Amino acid sequence: MKTLYSLRRFYPVETLFNGTLALAGRDQETTGFAWWAGNARLINLSGKLLGAHVAHAGLIVFWAGAMNLFEVAHFVPEKPMYEQGLILLPHLATLGWGVGPGGEVVDTFPYFVSGVLHLISSAVLGFGGIYHALLGPETLEESFPFFGYVWKDRNKMTTILGIHLILLGLGAFLLVFKALYFGGVYDTWAPGGGDVRRITNLTLSPSIIFGYLLKSPFGGEGWIVSVDDLEDIIGGHVWLGSICILGGIWHILTKPFAWARRAFVWSGEAYLSYSLGALSVFGFTACCFVWFNNTAYPSEFYGPTGPEASQAQAFTFLVRDQRLGANVGSAQGPTGLGKYLMRSPTGEIIFGGETMRFWDLRAPWLEPLRGPNGLDLSRLKKDIQPWQERRSAEYMTHAPLGSLNSVGGVATEINAVNYVSPRSWLATSHFVLGFFFFVGHLWHAGRARAAAAGFEKGIDRDFEPVLFMTPLN
């Protein structure tokens, strides 16, 4: 048997039938895991596991940079972003880079810079990943005790948790600083149809910020997804960043209490399951946010939300028929309800027809036409601006519907166009990934609990049929 760098390499779990197969010196014999078990071979090799994580970060950042440059290369300034299948440039535009009034792109150079910076960063991370995977020390405990750890060392684990929380808090403050001091962010609610502005009057009232968490997730309430002004969003990031940083300091300075030591499983696989569970919650929340929220995800870049496209259609035909002489206040539709306008269950004047179910939509092109009791009839007759008509006609024809083969629009519509909204892509992908991560959470939590309880993980390999077959090679 080979001389081991660290005695903690032994982790016998599975038996590979072909024991001679070795991969880069990390074989079944020395790790207890077969080559296909991936990072499980590195559970007790902190140096190699560091390499795997840094290399993975490099791949992520490389994708971001390459995809960013790909989108810049294909970008047509004359078309809205949401018509071009872009998923990265809308995020940069939302942060206020390269856009002017109405969400019009005035400069693509910041997008190019972003892509190049990510590519350069990915090269650094890639080098670090390869170095630690192949050349660096297998374990960090002996040479660099600050970066070393033992999975069951509860104090060290909460210290690592604290460092991560501080980094997340600093990330939240990066958005705050961008909005306050570095040019501002794009505000879809700015007068006249959206603009980049600095957020000066932050919402820091805890009753408002934490009130979102106490709202119902249904209907017009919408939990945190209902946030509809940037002051609240940036103020929320101040609160969240502060909580993360203070919580991080707390976890670095303290040891877990007895109830926490008893309640949790303290192993590498358990921490993996906790992380996957958290990411699953992030994915499901992001799905709801990108689907329903047109403030954090402005419609100028991501296309209209479903309710927004529906209300835009009602508005467009109200404008048309009013010009043709219809009395939109009293016209009756085929159901006996108002054809253009009707009353909501609570008495507000809302758009009639099928779009009545979306009556709690709020959108910057529509709100100026509301009064104290819903839509204001006199404003609908006298105050509609050309930009509102143009925008609603555009949104009406770009509903976030569409199939994977890029045939957009209503499924029964024969004149459908090649259009799938980025909202559809981002909401669907985050829902599906959130679900997969949840399954991964259950899987690894089950394995971690089984290991902690002391019963065998996996299947008994002693009498596995493949052990008695002739090797393929």
Curated annotation (Swiss-Prot):
Cofactor note (record): Binds multiple chlorophylls and provides some of the ligands for the Ca-4Mn-5O cluster of the oxygen-evolving complex. It may also provide a ligand for a Cl- that is required for oxygen evolution. PSII binds additional chlorophylls, carotenoids and specific lipids.
Q: What does this protein do?
A: One of the components of the core complex of photosystem II (PSII). It binds chlorophyll and helps catalyze the primary light-induced photochemical processes of PSII. PSII is a light-driven water:plastoquinone oxidoreductase, using light energy to abstract electrons from H(2)O, generating O(2) and a proton gradient subsequently used for ATP formation.
Membrane-crossing ranges are 69-93, 134-155, 178-200, 255-275, 291-312, 447-471
Q: Which residues carry this modification: Phosphothreonine?
A: T15
Record bears the keyword Electron transport: no
Q: Taxonomically, which superkingdom?
A: Eukaryota
Q: Which GO terms describe its molecular function?
A: chlorophyll binding; electron transporter, transferring electrons within the cyclic electron transport pathway of photosynthesis activity; metal ion binding
Q: Which residues form the propeptide?
A: 1-14
Q: What is the lineage of its organism?
A: Eukaryota, Viridiplantae, Streptophyta, Embryophyta, Tracheophyta
**Protein's GO biological process:** photosynthetic electron transport in photosystem II
The record ties this protein, via Gene3D superfamilies, to: photosystem ii from thermosynechococcus elongatus
Q: Which UniProt keywords apply?
A: Acetylation, Chlorophyll, Chloroplast, Chromophore, Manganese, Membrane, Metal-binding, Phosphoprotein, Photosynthesis, Photosystem II, Plastid, Thylakoid, Transmembrane, Transmembrane helix
Q: Membrane topology per the record?
A: Multi-pass membrane protein
Q: HAMAP family this protein is in?
A: PSII_PsbC_CP43
List the GO cellular component terms. chloroplast thylakoid membrane; photosystem II
Record localization: Plastid, Chloroplast thylakoid membrane
Q: How does it assemble?
A: PSII is composed of 1 copy each of membrane proteins PsbA, PsbB, PsbC, PsbD, PsbE, PsbF, PsbH, PsbI, PsbJ, PsbK, PsbL, PsbM, PsbT, PsbX, PsbY, PsbZ, Psb30/Ycf12, at least 3 peripheral proteins of the oxygen-evolving complex and a large number of cofactors. It forms dimeric complexes.
Q: What is this protein called?
A: Photosystem II CP43 reaction center protein
